[in-house]
């Protein structure tokens, strides 16, 4: 009695498949006979892309076939979203994290090395060039803090 409305909406060929859906063995047998009708309804039910699948889904909810459809659609859809986000997230995270340390570490040693190498030459040059002048000695000691200035002065002269 309840299957009356669905039968009216669909052609008379639908009643046999509807009764065959509950049974697993009858399902394969009607497939060869009605390959197109039987094959097309199951996919639309799984994928709510077509509006016609909704009425059919309600009719199939009464049968034992609907549970299978959600189960089939759930496994593929569930694993795909989780797998997709994790891959991109870890990939950029490690690549960006090592880059920042490398960038921060690289300039520090370079600048420290250059600063360390700069002070000795200027101090050695200034010492012999003006050994008698005492004011230059204190000034040279203060210059190492700003090695760039002390180095530029002797190189220009």
Curated annotation (Swiss-Prot):
Low complexity bias (residue ranges): 96-117, 124-157
Start and end residues of each stretch annotated as Disordered: 1-157
Source domain of life: Viruses
Biased composition (Pro residues): 8-31, 76-95
Regions of compositional bias (Basic residues) in chain numbering: 62-71
Name of the molecule in the record: Uncharacterized protein ORF4
Species whose genome carries this gene: Grapevine fleck virus (isolate Italy/MT48) (GFkV)
């Amino acid at each position: 009695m309840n299957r009356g409305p669905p039968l009216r909406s669909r052609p008379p060929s639908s009643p046999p498949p509807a009764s065959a859906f509950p049974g697993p063995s009858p399902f394969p047998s009607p497939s060869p006979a009605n390959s197109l009708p039987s094959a097309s309804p199951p996919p639309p039910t799984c994928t709510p892309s077509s509006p016609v699948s909704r009425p059919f889904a309600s009719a199939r909810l009464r049968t034992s076939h609907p549970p299978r459809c959600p189960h089939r659609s759930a496994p593929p859809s569930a694993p795909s979203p989780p797998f997709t986000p994790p891959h991109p997230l870890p990939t950029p995270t490690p690549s960006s994290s090592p880059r920042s340390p490398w960038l921060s570490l690289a300039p520090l040693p370079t600048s420290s090395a250059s600063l360390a190498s700069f002070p000795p030459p200027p101090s050695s040059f200034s010492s012999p060039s003006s050994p008698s002048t005492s004011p230059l000695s204190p000034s040279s000691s203060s210059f190492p803090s700003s090695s760039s200035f002390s180095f530029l002065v002797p190189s220009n002269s």
